[in-house]
Amino acid sequence: NVTRSSMPPMEEYVEEIRSLWDSHWLTNNGEKLKKLEAALKERLDVPYAALFTNGHLALEALLKALGLKGEVITTPFTFASTTHAIVRAGLTPVFCDIREDDYTMDPARAEALITPRTCAILPVHVYGNLCDDGALSAIAKKHGLKLIYDAAHAFHVSRDGVSAARMGDAAMFSFHATKVFHTVEGGCVTTADPELNRRLEPHKEKGNFMPFAQLMDLFDQYPVVVGCGHPFRAGGHVPEL
């Protein structure tokens, strides 16, 4: 069904914007962004959640942060952005057919597509139906491949107590206005791997690996013009979590 985007009560949204306005902190990892990130980690039961401008950039950054080269087995039964992110990361998509009952990637067919050039498997959770993570994880481990999930359709979905945000090496979530939870535009990468989360940082902050607090100390010494993050979007949607 086509539905209208969910919206918080106007009064709550205005209050969030007012507090943002009063703080004068409009970008660069502000309080609203950190509050949303903390709420996401708690709700999705995952140690790390890296926020991005949209789901496409989150997936593209994830592929680049993993340092992958070669072919990525994925599914054509998805929004075009999944494939575009693979191509923009300098990788080659290899399409795998889906299962008829839940429209998710068929693990047996995925394994049959593995070649010496395969570097990762990128399945897509569909309409809230989770992929067969047990089978796909076993295949990825057997062949030494990364397992990355497009979880745009699986916000706060779990199986046997395991959150979709914890499946595979990492997962991408979209917060586009058409999603169950949205920030009008937005997305994130979730992972339990601290090193991968660290490697995502330069893709968020103009190539910089330095911890944010340390970077701010340098800015106090050497003023520059910088900008990242969208607290106007983040602030208004924390109440929805």
Residue ranges and their predicted role:
Residues N1-L26:
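N-terminal "arm"/small-domain region of PLP-dependent enzymes with the aminotransferase-like
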Residues L44, G67, P116, A165-R166, ...:
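Structured loop/turn residues at beta-strand edges in well-structured enzyme cores
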Residues W21, A154-D160, M167-L241:
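Active-site region of PLP-dependent enzymes
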Residues W25, N29-E71, F77, H84-R88, ...:
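Phosphate-binding glycine-rich loop
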Residues E12-E16, E31, K35, S81, ...:
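Generic alpha-helical secondary structure signal
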Residues K64-A151, S158:
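PLP-dependent aminotransferase-like
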Residues N1-R4, L51, F95-D97, F173-S174:
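Structural signal for conserved beta-strand scaffold positions within catalytic alpha/beta enzyme cores
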